[in-house]
Amino acid sequence: MKEINPNDRPSSVSAGRPGSAVYPTTPLGEKFENIPTGRDVEWEPLVDFRRMDVSENTIHGAVAWAHGDEIIHSFGGNVLVYGRSMMKPLMMKPFVEVLKDLDWKQKAISCSSHNGDTEHVAAAQSLLTESEWGLMQCPLDVPLIQFGRQVRRPRRWFHTCSGEHAAILKGMRLMGMSRAGYTLPSSDWFPLYLDVLREYMNKPNWEPLRVAKDGCGFPTVSNTVNELALMFANLVARRDDD
């Protein structure tokens, strides 16, 4: 019987497109230049869960402290990671001017993750007219924490990122941007977001090594722990800018 080359196995994805080949080729995953894996960095133990003094689960990670444009201390390695939901305040920066008239509840829900509580959903929905609700592309979900009557029918508004999605859709309308495919890196707001990251890192020529899809559907870009620390130090230092 002829042995099949693993790279020639049939795939539902057309040849040449991501996912068309068998991946990964090793159980430890592929290696890519300038992208260290979890086996390549010197993680530090941050939290140790014990049962009767015996360690059962240890969480490892990396930490960096920044002041202005300077890293003053770090440990665990300058690991490459995705900022994901912690980047919400920076993702809203391209829309500061057009959304400046939002009330504080609307601003808070735009820049944060939420539990899907009644007041959270109300704040998120208030950002859009009811006729615009159908544009929402965040995943279906149920409230994160439920008491009393249980919500069992998933809805987009219950998703932890629905406020951010609604705010970006509103901002794009006010800026005259097409909202078709608004969750894709090819959308008009995304290059503006990358410019914000360059500004807050003080790295005008920076480019992300990877752009991936976050759990809510929005793009998430790779940054080192040091880069994230610098951005959030500057976010605090410039908190009164807008």
Located regions from the model:
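Active-site-adjacent helix/loop patches that line small-molecule binding or acyl-intermediate pockets
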Residues: 3-6, 22-43, 105-218, 223-225, ...
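Active-site SXXK
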Residues: 83-100, 119
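Short, solvent-exposed loop/edge-beta patches enriched in aromatic
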Residues: 67-69, 97-103, 132
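Glycine-/proline-rich flexible loop or hinge segments
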Residues: 71-78, 102-112
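Contiguous, well-ordered alpha-helical segments that form the cores/surfaces of helical PPI scaffolds
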Residues: 61-64, 89-97, 167-171, 229-233
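Structured C-terminal helix/loop/strand segments within mature extracytoplasmic catalytic/sensor domains
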Residues: 233-242
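Beta-lactamase-like hydrolase cores
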Residues: 2-3, 7, 16, 22-80
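Alpha-helix capping and helix-loop boundary segments enriched in small/acidic/polar residues
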Residues: 78-83, 115
